[in-house]
Amino acid sequence: MMINPLIYLHYNYTGKLDHRPTVGTSPGTRDPKTIAFLVVCSFIILENLTVLLAIWKNHRFHNRMYFFIGNLALCDLLASVAYLVNLLLSGEKTLQLSPVLWFVREGSMFVTLGASIFSLLAIAIERHLTMIKMRPYDASKNYRVFLLIGTCWLVAVLLGALPILGWNCLGNLPDCSTILPLYTKKYVAFCIIVFIVLLLAMSVLYARIYILVKSSSQKVSKHRNSEHAMSLLRTVIIVVGVFIACWMPIFVLLLLDVACERPCPILYKADWFIAVAVLNSAMNPIIYTLASREMRRAFLGLVCGVCYRGNGSGNDSGNKQFQEPSRSRSKSWSSQTHPNQSQQSSRPAELDREQETGHGEISVVAGGAAQASQREGEGGNGGR
């Protein structure tokens, strides 16, 4: 294919042609850095695919919070796919792309990033609404989850499609970004400001949720529920903190790109900043498994099930090994959907669920805190 003169013009104007990595004499030769990134992306795809399979195959995970976790895993998986495609179409192939393909290549990264941030914010909004309304979990209200998830993706796609719809710097070279030569600096600044504002709003909502949970739990049991609230806080800090730690460097770099009148040398090292951001997609599944014993058991059951199936024996015993310990806990998930059934066993099941789950804590903590006053009344009636 021939070099596209428009792409060449923008890359030459921003100085990216002079800072491109040297390529071997053989066509299609890739440097070790790119190969390493491709391997990492493949691992991230497999990792998040395992999360999605674990949630899909385990009915006890079919509730609001795990739907949100599944959506985050889907965002991470698609982000890795987008970055992998970006790598495969980079280097020599970049100059051969049409402007439309270039916008699709870069816009897909913005779409998955936006979907991840909007999904984290949707989790905070859904938990906050549940706490404010003080209602227990109701499986019939799952439509609200899918509505939020659909809205997240719709807004993310619209945000990522703005450049291809006309908000770009084609024909206006002085306004072009150095890192993204066909993007106008105004669009880059707009996206980063929106993302940072959303992260701040998310932090405020999670802080308010924690305060509500802690104040409600102290009315019931100062010891056990305070530990539960602190565990919730730690989980939230890990999820949001890792996201901010991974993405903030590239946000700062893009803001520097907007502010610099002349290209700064560090802007030509953006690949490393993007790689750190993509690592967030690898960290999330690790957080899920470390924070939730249920998730660990589901992963082990899934992996060992594949191993047993490959060996052709022991499949049934392997599945029983990982399914039997969770039967008693699955009752607690069903009791959350039908709170009027077996009220005498609801409190032990809830305490067991609080101890056994990490991210699961987030899904039940709103219901547990919302029923705090009801449990006090039940405890008083039992004492009489």
From Swiss-Prot:
Extracellular side: 1-34, 86-105, 166-186, 257-271
Glycoprotein is among the record's keywords: yes
Transmembrane regions: 35-55, 65-85, 106-126, 145-165, 187-207, 236-256, 272-292
InterPro entries reported for this sequence: EDG3_rcpt, GPCR_Rhodpsn, GPCR_Rhodpsn_7TM, S1P_rcpt
Gene3D superfamilies, alphabetized: Rhodopsin 7-helix transmembrane proteins
SUPFAM superfamilies for the chain: Family A G protein-coupled receptor-like
Residue ranges of the region described as Disordered: 315-384
Protein name as catalogued: Sphingosine 1-phosphate receptor 3
